[in-house]
């Protein structure tokens, strides 16, 4: 993506954001939208700060992710104003003055102290919708996070602009570069920690810059859904590798998962291939007007069909779903919205005026219950796992006969399988953001 084209896309993106903000402010009865970037937070009984995490509402407007004590101010009919904190400091590296393809579209004021922002903020704070954490308060400018404004903006965030899709594609490219390096490190016999370091080096981002903690799981560690321990010694023998890792680009996240078998001729590889084929079909079902809840239920049936074919369960997919057996093997949701945040907001929103669409009974970890519409980007991440705690529940609930325990014992040392792509819902066929990048040379 060239700089000029990003500039053009950003200009259009900003027009969309201002139109949304105009409507949100009208609904809430406010004259100004004020968004602090956030503040630094210090560890308890210490003078060391935590890694800074920018306010997602702030980085929706400008691609600044490491700028505490900065502000975005928008008043309908005017250009957005960015109050950019650039302190005098010899202890730390001072951020460069704003530059690049976005600055021509905003009015920028540079401040040297956090307090210097105050006279640049709207004087009548009661007329401001101020979106941020309480710690960002400055004088009378105290975040109020009005529901009418947040509900509208969060709901609309599901619909990505061409600019957002462009930078999300960049995040895909970075992450796939890391995934390739990670697979090579796995094939070379590296430890989880070594694989993680290979990933970070290939992406060019450290743990504080990545959108979430890398899941680098060898062998049975793949049965821990959010395994982040990073063992320093590679297990012997090396059987399997599950990697769930993304990258950041201009404030937007990617989220990709792959699973590999050490032995390409093993039954575990055959199981991976079956889940991979099913995952592609699930991604192709991302269509406008489809209920994501139904996609999730359909995923359960598809995965249980695979387990039945492999002799791991002894009952029909429908019976496994009805009795809760399927949840022991596939205990998480099919996916979620993604964008500025890995688990992007408003996945349960009934409308842009609030309300909530509940999860289906028996599926407490599904993160998206909305109808799919053009512009949404969702993850599709089916998984099959061999988790002792959940399989013990199957026995306790009287469904032991539904499972072939000898087959479970054969697959348990591999941990589990998860395969995840990002998919754009369009007016027609969906666009898979992830697969073409892996397929490229």
Curated annotation (Swiss-Prot):
Binds 2 manganese ions per subunit. Mn(2+) 1 binds at residues 255, 336, 381, 420. It catalyses: Xaa-L-Pro dipeptide + H2O = an L-alpha-amino acid + L-proline. Its EC number is 3.4.13.9. Mn(2+) 2 binds at residues 244, 255, 420. CDD domains: Prolidase. GO terms for cellular component: cytosol. Splits dipeptides with a prolyl residue in the C-terminal position. Belongs to the peptidase M24B family. Bacterial-type prolidase subfamily. This is Xaa-Pro dipeptidase. It comes from Xanthomonas campestris pv. campestris (strain B100). The gene is pepQ.
């Amino acid at each position: 993506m060239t700089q000029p084209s990003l500039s053009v896309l950003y200009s259009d993106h900003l027009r969309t954001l201002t139109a949304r903000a105009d409507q949100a402010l009208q609904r809430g009865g406010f004259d100004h939208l004020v968004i602090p970037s956030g503040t630094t937070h210090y560890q308890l009984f210490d003078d060391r700060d935590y890694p800074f995490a920018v306010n997602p509402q702030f980085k929706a407007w400008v691609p600044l992710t490491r700028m505490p004590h900065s502000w975005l101010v928008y008043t309908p009919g005017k250009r957005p104003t960015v109050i950019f904190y650039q302190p005098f400091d010899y202890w730390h590296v001072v951020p460069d003055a704003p530059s690049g393809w976005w600055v021509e579209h905003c009015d920028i004021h540079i401040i040297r102290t956090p307090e210097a922002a105050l006279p640049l903020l709207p004087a009548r704070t009661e007329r401001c919708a101020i979106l941020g954490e309480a710690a960002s308060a400055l004088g009378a400018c105290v975040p109020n996070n009005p529901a009418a404004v947040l509900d509208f903006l969060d709901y609309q965030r599901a619909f990505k602009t061409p600019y957002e899709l462009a930078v999300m594609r960049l995040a895909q490219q970075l992450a796939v570069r890391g995934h390739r390096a990670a697979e090579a490190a796995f094939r070379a016999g590296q430890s989880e920690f070594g694989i993680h370091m290979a990933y970070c080096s290939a992406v060019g981002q450290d743990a504080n810059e990545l959108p979430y903690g890398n899941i680098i799981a060898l062998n049975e560690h793949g049965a821990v859904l959010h395994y982040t321990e990073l063992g320093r010694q590679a297990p012997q023998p090396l059987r399997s590798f599950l990697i769930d890792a993304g990258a950041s680009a201009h404030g937007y996240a990617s989220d990709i998962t792959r699973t590999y078998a050490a032995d390409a001729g093993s039954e575990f590889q055959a199981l991976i291939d079956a889940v991979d084929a099913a995952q592609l079909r699930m991604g192709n079902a991302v269509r406008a007007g489809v209920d994501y809840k139904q996609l999730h239920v359909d995923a359960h049936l598809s995965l249980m069909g695979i387990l039945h074919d492999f002799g791991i369960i002894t009952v029909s997919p429908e019976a496994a779903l009805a009795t809760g057996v399927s949840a022991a093997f596939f205990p998480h949701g099919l996916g979620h919205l993604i964008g500025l945040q890995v688990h992007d907001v408003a996945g349960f929103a009934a409308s842009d005026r609030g309300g909530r669409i509940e999860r289906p009974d028996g599926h407490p970890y599904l993160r998206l219950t909305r109808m799919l519409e053009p512009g949404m980007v969702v993850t599709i991440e089916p998984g099959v796992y061999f988790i002792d705690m959940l399989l013990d529940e199957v026995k306790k609930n009287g469904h032991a006969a539904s499972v072939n325990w000898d087959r479970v014992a054969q697959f348990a040392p591999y941990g589990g399988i998860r395969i995840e792509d990002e998919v754009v819902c369009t007016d027609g066929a969906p666009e898979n953001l992830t697969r073409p990048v892996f397929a490229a040379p």
